[in-house]
Amino acid sequence: MVDYHSAGQPYPYGGNGPGPNGDYMAQEDDWDRDLLLDPAWEKQQRKTFTAWCNSHLRKAGTQIENIDEDFRDGLKLMLLLEVISGERLPKPERGKMRVHKINNVNKALDFIASKGVNVVSIGAEEIVDGNAKMTLGMIWTIILRFAIQDISVEETSAKEGLLLWCQRKTAPYKNVNVQNFHISWKDGLAFNALIHRHRPELIEYDKLRKDDPVTNLNNAFEVAEKYLDIPKMLDAEDIVNTARPDEKAIMTYVSSFYHAFSGAQKAETAANRICKVLAVNQENEHLMEDYEKLASDLLEWIRRTIPWLEDRSPQKTIQEMQQKLEDFRDYRRVHKPPKVQEKCQLEINFNTLQTKLRLSNRPAFMPSEGRMVSDINTGWQHLEQAEKGYEEWLLNEIRRLEPLDHLAEKFRQKASIHEAWTEGKEAMLKQKDYETATLSDIKALIRKHEAFESDLAAHQDRVEQIAAIAQELNELDYYDSPSVNARCQKICDQWDVLGSLTHSRREALEKTEKQLETIDELHLEYAKRAAPFNNWMESAMEDLQDMFIVHTIEEIEGLIAAHDQFKATLPDADREREAILGIQREAQRIADLHSIKLSGNNPYTSVTPQVINSKWERVQQLVPTRDRALQDEQSRQQCNERLRRQFAGQANIVGPWMQTKMEEIGRISIEMHGTLEDQLQHLKHYEQSIVDYKPNLELLEHEHQLVEEALIFDNKHTNYTMEHIRVGWEQLLTTIARTINEVENQILTRDAKGISQEQMQEFRASFNHFDKDHCGALGPEEFKACLISLGYDVENDRQGDAEFNRIMSLVDPNGSGSVTFQAFIDFMSRETTDTDTADQVIASFKVLAGDKNYITAEELRRELPPEQAEYCIARMAPYRGPDAAPGALDYKSFSTALYGESDL
């Protein structure tokens, strides 16, 4: 018997649970009768045990309300035991006295003890007195014996069997893991899983949520009560709000599910047994149907195949007989093997079916009439009998037809070759291509005709062979002799026609050859004289149409003289043209007399009379055109010469004037007469005189435009071009403007740096001394020599090179490789005058800042104009020193950045 105390938990009603000897309420030595239950557990047990008792008492038409009061007289206790056991108990005593009640309870306890349950620890007096703990313990003992003890799953029973049953049923469900009868059931999913496993239509399991246990529990309780007739024995709130639900209450309720579904399992077992029997029967019926269909199909195939094998009617051609042989071999190779397999499978299926029927106590299978295995074997024997000799008969027929078919094929091949050779021959012999042929064509046609005559004679043997084969096929009674005879007759008739046409064509070719030889001599004469004359006309046309390009009067006068000489040769050329055309007319007369259609092309030349006449007419048209073109060009060259002289006269005045002005400007920029203001005034007057000269340049531009419009590209009367004049004018304006700007910058530098007039003249003298080419700029070596002359230590050593590179970076920051006079003055002024420095600006900011190392925005706005103050605030970096105040600005880095000593 199963030990319900295997988990080592104390038995709450004073016993050790079922022991090895099957006792359910073994007495404990240390049992305290006054020990009270956990209030939550007691509440759960009262509700569960009451509902369980009522689920059985209602069968007797009664129920209890208070479990520890309603069982005190023992009457309903005895009734409960009769209902759940199905046995009659001794007649109860109906008295109201205490002794009557004790006797009734003892009768109930004696009945429980008779079922192998130890009830020594349960006293009838305590039940009669309404001891709740003892009453609940007694009911739990009854539940164990009559509701749980009989549960058996595999080799486990009672509690372990019920737990294993729950685990098996809920295993497929997510979030369900039944390990006990307390906390495994708190979320309600296990109850719902049990119901869904047996009655899936009652529960929508996928919609349940593990985090909503009250809803899950109520759903399971309501469905069980409504559809499974299992009363609600538990409260969802009690289970959820209890850390560890009462195990006995849960077991009692779960056992009701077990008993409710056990009936369904029995019905399912019975249904499975019926289905198994029906499945065997259906399988047998399916095998019977398969046998009937397979046998019917096989017999039908045999019935259709035997007449085909028995047909021995000969065919006309070897191809047809070979096809029959191929069909037979295809039958033996493709069609028959599956049928052999079907016949074998049919016998196997029949034997298997009979064995299954015999083993399942079914009557033997009797196929339909004519579909017995013996009927199939008989039909198969007839089939194999029909096969015998069929292949041998086919091979004999093929051997008989093979020579005859070979002879017929030989006839067809020779006839086809001959017909292919004769194709187009009649049309070729009938054509009159010689009427339009040249002499060389006629000779080629005669040689070609001779070759054809040789080929015709060679084909005579083939025609005779074709006729002989046709005669042999007639004698062997070939089935297609009529078509052979018709084809042979057609070949013979065509052969006679070809012979007649060959003779007629030879005569026509020889006659035409003689006539064309005469015409050919005339064509040769024509070609010898037409070719040189045609070349002369083409050369003349090229010369008359030649695009002459002349630039002088002398050149056009030479062209006019050459043209006059050409015109003097035209009468002799016209007489030669008439003689050449007369030769062509004579050749055409002979062709017309003998009905010869000339192709129109002289084989010796491509120059036709039409070409000669066309080119001669073209020469006649080009001569006056050339006359007019030469006269027009002569007039144009005379006009161009006048334009050249006009432009040269003006250019020879403007060019030297600009050159003189350029030299004077260079001299003014170098010489140092008077003050800078005097030089500036003199240069501006000089600039105005240059601007006043511009109308002369505009007049020259007008003359140049006329020259360009006349497409005059050279002028021997002057060395000046308009491009030279324009460049010189632009250079003149640029030079005077640059020189004025240099003087203005020198004045600005002098005033800003406090340079005296004597110092400025000294700087100019030094600069001019080393500006050897008078270009207005010093190269690096010239500048170094100048610095050395002024006392700077820039000799060719390491220290001197470093100093020179520093100075060059100041005067030539762009790295152009030259030093202008303005850059030279700036450098010298910085070296000789007092200038602002970064240190001076830092000192000024320190005064504004009150001798602090930083300055604030308020101090800048207070001491500087608004625009300069905001400029400084926007560009000054925050001051990071240890004495920095909020909003402190770094005026030192700002000052050094102003002079390029750091980044702004």
Swiss-Prot record:
<keyword id="KW-0009">Actin-binding</keyword>
<feature type="binding site">
    <location>
        <position position="771"/>
    </location>
    <ligand>
        <name>Ca(2+) 1</name>
    </ligand>
</feature>
<keyword id="KW-0813">Transport</keyword>
<keyword id="KW-0963">Cytoplasm</keyword>
<dbReference type="Pfam" id="PF00307">
    <property type="entry name" value="CH"/>
</dbReference>
<dbReference type="InterPro" id="IPR018159">
    <property type="entry name" value="Spectrin/alpha-actinin"/>
</dbReference>
<feature type="repeat" description="Spectrin 2">
    <location>
        <begin position="406"/>
        <end position="511"/>
    </location>
</feature>
<feature type="repeat" description="Spectrin 4">
    <location>
        <begin position="642"/>
        <end position="745"/>
    </location>
</feature>
<feature type="binding site">
    <location>
        <position position="773"/>
    </location>
    <ligand>
        <name>Ca(2+) 1</name>
    </ligand>
</feature>
<feature type="binding site">
    <location>
        <position position="814"/>
    </location>
    <ligand>
        <name>Ca(2+) 2</name>
    </ligand>
</feature>
<dbReference type="GO" id="GO:0030864">
    <property type="term" value="C:cortical actin cytoskeleton"/>
</dbReference>
<dbReference type="InterPro" id="IPR002017">
    <property type="entry name" value="Spectrin_repeat"/>
</dbReference>
<keyword id="KW-0653">Protein transport</keyword>
<dbReference type="InterPro" id="IPR014837">
    <property type="entry name" value="EF-hand_Ca_insen"/>
</dbReference>
<feature type="domain" description="Calponin-homology (CH) 1">
    <location>
        <begin position="43"/>
        <end position="147"/>
    </location>
</feature>
<dbReference type="GO" id="GO:0048384">
    <property type="term" value="P:retinoic acid receptor signaling pathway"/>
</dbReference>
<dbReference type="InterPro" id="IPR036872">
    <property type="entry name" value="CH_dom_sf"/>
</dbReference>
<protein>
    <recommendedName>
        <fullName>Alpha-actinin-4</fullName>
    </recommendedName>
</protein>
<dbReference type="GO" id="GO:0070161">
    <property type="term" value="C:anchoring junction"/>
</dbReference>
<dbReference type="GO" id="GO:0005737">
    <property type="term" value="C:cytoplasm"/>
</dbReference>
<keyword id="KW-0539">Nucleus</keyword>
<dbReference type="GO" id="GO:0030054">
    <property type="term" value="C:cell junction"/>
</dbReference>
<dbReference type="InterPro" id="IPR002048">
    <property type="entry name" value="EF_hand_dom"/>
</dbReference>
<dbReference type="GO" id="GO:0030036">
    <property type="term" value="P:actin cytoskeleton organization"/>
</dbReference>
<keyword id="KW-0965">Cell junction</keyword>
<feature type="binding site">
    <location>
        <position position="812"/>
    </location>
    <ligand>
        <name>Ca(2+) 2</name>
    </ligand>
</feature>
<dbReference type="GO" id="GO:0035357">
    <property type="term" value="P:peroxisome proliferator activated receptor signaling pathway"/>
</dbReference>
<dbReference type="GO" id="GO:0015031">
    <property type="term" value="P:protein transport"/>
</dbReference>
<comment type="subunit">
    <text>Homodimer; antiparallel. Component of the CART complex. May interact with nuclear receptors.</text>
</comment>
<dbReference type="GO" id="GO:0055001">
    <property type="term" value="P:muscle cell development"/>
</dbReference>
<keyword id="KW-0677">Repeat</keyword>
<dbReference type="Pfam" id="PF08726">
    <property type="entry name" value="EFhand_Ca_insen"/>
</dbReference>
<dbReference type="GO" id="GO:0005509">
    <property type="term" value="F:calcium ion binding"/>
</dbReference>
<dbReference type="GO" id="GO:0005634">
    <property type="term" value="C:nucleus"/>
</dbReference>
<feature type="domain" description="EF-hand 1">
    <location>
        <begin position="758"/>
        <end position="793"/>
    </location>
</feature>
<feature type="binding site">
    <location>
        <position position="818"/>
    </location>
    <ligand>
        <name>Ca(2+) 2</name>
    </ligand>
</feature>
<dbReference type="GO" id="GO:0045944">
    <property type="term" value="P:positive regulation of transcription by RNA polymerase II"/>
</dbReference>
<feature type="binding site">
    <location>
        <position position="782"/>
    </location>
    <ligand>
        <name>Ca(2+) 1</name>
    </ligand>
</feature>
<feature type="domain" description="Calponin-homology (CH) 2">
    <location>
        <begin position="156"/>
        <end position="262"/>
    </location>
</feature>
<dbReference type="InterPro" id="IPR001715">
    <property type="entry name" value="CH_dom"/>
</dbReference>
<dbReference type="GO" id="GO:0005886">
    <property type="term" value="C:plasma membrane"/>
</dbReference>
<dbReference type="GO" id="GO:0003713">
    <property type="term" value="F:transcription coactivator activity"/>
</dbReference>
